[in-house]
UniProtKB/Swiss-Prot annotation:
Record note on modification: Contains L-DOPA (3',4'-dihydroxyphenylalanine).
Entry-annotated residues carrying 3',4'-dihydroxyphenylalanine: 32
Oligomeric form and interacting partners: Monomer.
Subcellular location: Secreted
GO CC annotations on file: extracellular region
Role this protein plays: Potent reversible, competitive inhibitor of tyrosinase (phenol oxidase) in the nanomolar range.
Name used for this protein in its record: Tyrosinase inhibitor
Keywords: Disulfide bond, Hydroxylation, Knottin, Secreted
UniProt superkingdom: Eukaryota
Free-text comment on this protein's domains from its UniProt entry: The presence of a 'disulfide through disulfide knot' structurally defines this protein as a knottin.
Disulfide bonds: 11-25, 18-29, 24-36
Main location: secreted
Amino acid sequence: AVTDNEIVPQCLANGSKCYSHDVCCTKRCHNYAKKCVT
């Protein structure tokens, strides 16, 4: 069975730790703070 997580990619909310833009819901990862931003 295919789970919802495999259908819809999980994304990180603003303020979440990130290392790439793709992982953030807003597609913007702050280069220095390493957090998703709007």
